[in-house]
């Protein structure tokens, strides 16, 4: 077997770093606009460019376009403002009900809504909709609305007090980056075939257990320190850009 390298296409961890690089550059030039205009413009552009039929993996440009509204909103809104708005008890109750409803719908109707998954990966255009391409922008907008709503609902029920998982929550970047190593090892071994074959009804329990262990390993001090060292220049850039 031969291994080929494409210098312009990245589907692993590096795409995230590349996307962050371009997002910081874009934000440097858009910070002069009013936040509401910048946010609306980023959403509209993502809705329109979904019609493209070009290679969407080159420089990860499609994922940059689709995920930039989340990045931009996190850039312009302070955590203090979000916390103040989400402290309302009615919102917390609505969040619990909404999240339970969301998970029930996903669990019960996953076969009917799984076709929308490509919109969440950010890599594909509306051509995946086949006969529904005309409604692509509206579907994309709906996905944005639901995604932002779910994010804010999660934030509203997050406890203020720290507990055992709080430290790992602060190190989510290192978990994201280094868990790929364990995925590659898992796929290279025969476990992904052996477990479902040997334990057809309980193999998913092993996956959950492995996932928990991997999360704790990747959330330790050393992986986190390495990620912070790599991202330190980006943090300094962000502070300078806001001045």
Name the predicted role of every residue range.
Residues 1-243:
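Alpha-helical transmembrane segments and their immediate juxtamembrane cytosolic regions
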């Amino acid at each position: 077997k031969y291994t080929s390298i494409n210098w312009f296409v990245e589907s692993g961890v590096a795409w995230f770093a590349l996307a962050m690089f371009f997002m910081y550059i874009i934000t440097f030039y858009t910070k002069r606009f009013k936040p509401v205009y910048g946010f609306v413009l980023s959403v509209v552009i993502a809705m329109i460019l979904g019609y493209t039929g070009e290679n969407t993996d080159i420089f990860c440009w499609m994922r940059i376009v689709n995920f930039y509204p989340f990045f931009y909103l996190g850039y312009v809104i302070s955590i203090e403002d979000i916390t103040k708005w989400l402290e309302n008890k009615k919102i917390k109750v609505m969040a619990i009900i909404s999240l339970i409803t969301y998970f029930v719908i996903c669990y019960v109707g996953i076969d009917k809504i799984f076709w929308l998954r490509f919109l969440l990966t950010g890599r594909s255009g509306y051509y995946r909709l086949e006969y529904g391409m005309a409604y692509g922008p509206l579907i994309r907008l709906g996905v944005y609305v639901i995604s932002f709503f779910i994010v804010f609902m999660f934030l509203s029920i997050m406890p203020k007090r720290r507990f055992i998982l709080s430290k790992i929550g602060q190190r989510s970047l290192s978990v994201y980056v280094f868990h790929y190593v364990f995925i590659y090892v898992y796929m290279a071994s025969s476990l992904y075939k052996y477990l479902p074959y040997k334990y057809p009804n309980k193999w998913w329990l092993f996956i959950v257990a492995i996932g928990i262990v991997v999360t704790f390993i990747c959330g330790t001090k050393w992986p986190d320190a390495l990620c912070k060292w790599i991202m330190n220049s980006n943090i300094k850039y962000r502070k300078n850009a806001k001045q």
